[in-house]
């Protein structure tokens, strides 16, 4: 597991260039272009289980699914940021991508790495552990708490995304979306703790 570190206001065009919006829709088409303009090494070197640390307002900008779909497809384990743009936050939950809001952990990691606020850094020297049961992030020897994630978010993540979660829920109810065993309604996606426009 490695850490990719970035600064504030990482927008969706930085995560996935807008020029590919109408030509790349499938995960395998999206992956080679992730962070292409911000960090050209990311798509070539990212590995399943890696974590992204970032500053404020991560995922701001235009509303597109490709950034979230791509990050999930390359195996990003989690994103730890100071805050998220509202639309990105909701899209990430729908795809089953784990987002954690913990400014203190981000600051601690930045201090340990003495990093630039705008350039991605790959590190294996600083140990990072995420404990969902305890709602904590450990950076080196320091542990920081983050707001407890609602059970619905964790269930959607464990299922692999909102679509898979809903399908499994309908199968369990035996309704197939039409019977009386369930409402057939898509669960409401929870909001971020400190949403951005």
Task: Show the residue positions of the predicted features.
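A detector of low-complexity, intrinsically disordered, Ser/Thr/Gly/Pro/Ala-rich segments
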Residues: 119, 125, 136, 184-187, ...
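Feature captures the catalytic cores and cofactor-binding loops of soluble hydro-lyases/lyases
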Residues: 16, 22-134
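N-terminal, positively charged, Ser/Thr/Ala/Gly-biased leader segments
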Residues: 1-20, 24, 164-172
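Alpha-helical scaffold segments in soluble metabolic enzymes
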Residues: 14, 29, 33, 91, ...
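Intrinsic disorder/low-complexity segments
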Residues: 173-197
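Conformational gate/switch positions in structured elements
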Residues: 9, 62, 160-162
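Long, charged alpha-helical interface segments
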Residues: 124-172
